[in-house]
């Protein structure tokens, strides 16, 4: 079930088969389910597994048209078929045809696809597949039509995704990028989420300030109404989705200036959240400038936390990387393999000075954050870290 920008976890058993491993559907509506019955690690043997065909009671399969024998316009109409497998098969055939077609055929297919997508009486799945087929078959024609679909409740989120389908695509006109940006204020969380992701993929830096507002939305404790106390992070948290997506979009835009300009202000939370992922001298400079100009103790503590996070970066994965994906990985975080970078020494010196001069509340906060981020200052560990005494050996699968 839909819940805001995401979905609630939901599982509804509909067929009873021992140890099912995979499922597929054909264009006539039949399901094929594979079972790993009696299987062990090696998967072999004469009586291991089976594939079952599942059909509704009294099901009468309908013959599937031979798509290779149909005209291009007939294929477009077949996009209205209720079977997703059939629609996918038809879409692929259409795209193959259009790729090698003459201009007249391309024009007629484009008009037919636009007609299906515009048809409010058609099913949503038919309209969406027509939209996406047009996006792939004729990007220019899609660009002309997309703006009108942004106001369509059924198509808006899909149109936005299609606009941003290829990150940094030069065929997306500035007016269309601006129209997508306007959807950041949509009342629909799903449309808003699509617009947030699109802003990052399209490189729309003008959206940065609005994205920071979304990333700074107040969050409630998901366990506040629970009968028994429970850690917030253990619970589904749909309201975190939009702020998280917005933060990631700001990072994708490398919007350091917008983040610094948001400090202090109502978007401070989102700005600092994004800055923790933006390892650049400009980000560190901006944080130190803000630190020197603000007297807000809470903001100062958050800036120091961000600087401590930025004092290390993620190392490149190599065969010698310590415990990245072994059976006992180091879960201390926030990085798998901490490495210093060009600003590490500068941040460390500033933290050391602050530790020597700060009043007790700030000094305690700095020590806590050094321990939390596993950062050493002045050659000594900030706090004990659980040592990985045993080598993380891979799991041995029986022969």
Residue ranges of each PLM-predicted region?
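Beta-propeller domains with acidic blade repeats across secreted/periplasmic ectodomains
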Residues: 1-74, 89, 93-96, 100
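Short beta-alpha connecting loops at secondary-structure transitions
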Residues: 7-16, 34-39, 213-235, 239, ...
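Amphipathic alpha-helical scaffolding segments comprising HEAT/armadillo-like alpha-solenoid repeats
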Residues: 69-76, 100-118, 138-150, 169-185, ...
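Conserved, compact domain cores that house catalytic/ligand-binding motifs in diverse enzymes
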Residues: 80-110
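Residue-level detector of extended alpha-helical repeat arrays and alpha-solenoid scaffolds
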Residues: 86-87, 124-127, 156, 192, ...
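Structural signature of alpha-helical solenoid repeat scaffolds
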Residues: 95, 135, 164, 200, ...
């Amino acid at each position: 079930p839909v819940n805001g920008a995401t979905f609630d976890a939901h599982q509804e058993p509909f067929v009873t088969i021992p140890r099912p491993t995979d499922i597929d559907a054909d264009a006539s509506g039949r399901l094929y389910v594979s079972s790993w019955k009696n299987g062990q690690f090696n998967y072999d043997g004469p009586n291991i597994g089976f594939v079952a065909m599942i059909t509704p009671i009294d099901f009468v399969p309908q013959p599937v048209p031979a798509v290779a024998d149909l005209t291009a316009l007939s294929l477009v109409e077949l996009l209205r078929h209720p079977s997703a497998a059939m629609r996918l098969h038809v879409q692929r055939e259409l795209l193959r045809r259009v790729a090698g077609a003459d201009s007249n055929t391309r024009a007629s297919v484009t008009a037919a696809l636009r007609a299906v997508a515009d048809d409010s009486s058609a099913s949503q799945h038919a309209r969406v597949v027509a939209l996406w087929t047009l996006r792939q078959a004729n990007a220019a024609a899609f660009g002309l039509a997309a703006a009108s679909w942004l106001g369509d409740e059924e198509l808006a989120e899909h149109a936005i995704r299609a606009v941003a389908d290829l990150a940094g695509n030069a065929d997306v006109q500035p007016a269309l990028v601006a129209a997508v940006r306007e959807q950041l204020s949509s009342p629909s969380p799903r449309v808003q989420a699509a617009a947030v992701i699109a802003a990052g993929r399209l490189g729309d830096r003008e959206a940065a300030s609005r994205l920071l507002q979304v990333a700074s939305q107040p969050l409630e404790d998901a366990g506040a109404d629970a009968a028994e106390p429970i850690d917030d992070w253990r619970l589904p948290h749909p309201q975190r989705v939009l702020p998280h997506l917005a933060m990631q979009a700001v990072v994708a835009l490398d919007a350091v200036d917008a983040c610094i300009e948001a400090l202090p202000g109502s978007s401070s939370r989102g700005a600092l959240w994004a800055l923790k992922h933006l390892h650049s001298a400009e980000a560190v400079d901006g944080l130190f400038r803000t630190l020197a100009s603000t007297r807000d103790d809470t903001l100062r503590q958050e800036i120091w936390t961000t600087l401590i996070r930025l004092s290390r970066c993620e190392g490149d994965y190599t065969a010698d990387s310590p415990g990245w994906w072994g059976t006992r990985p180091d879960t201390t975080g926030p990085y798998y393999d901490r490495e210093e970078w060009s600003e590490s020494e500068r941040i460390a010196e500033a933290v050391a000075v602050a530790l020597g001069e700060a009043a007790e509340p700030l000094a305690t906060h700095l020590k806590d954050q050094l321990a939390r981020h596993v950062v050493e200052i002045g050659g000594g560990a900030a706090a004990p870290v659980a040592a990985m005494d045993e080598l993380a050996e891979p799991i041995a699968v029986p022969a």
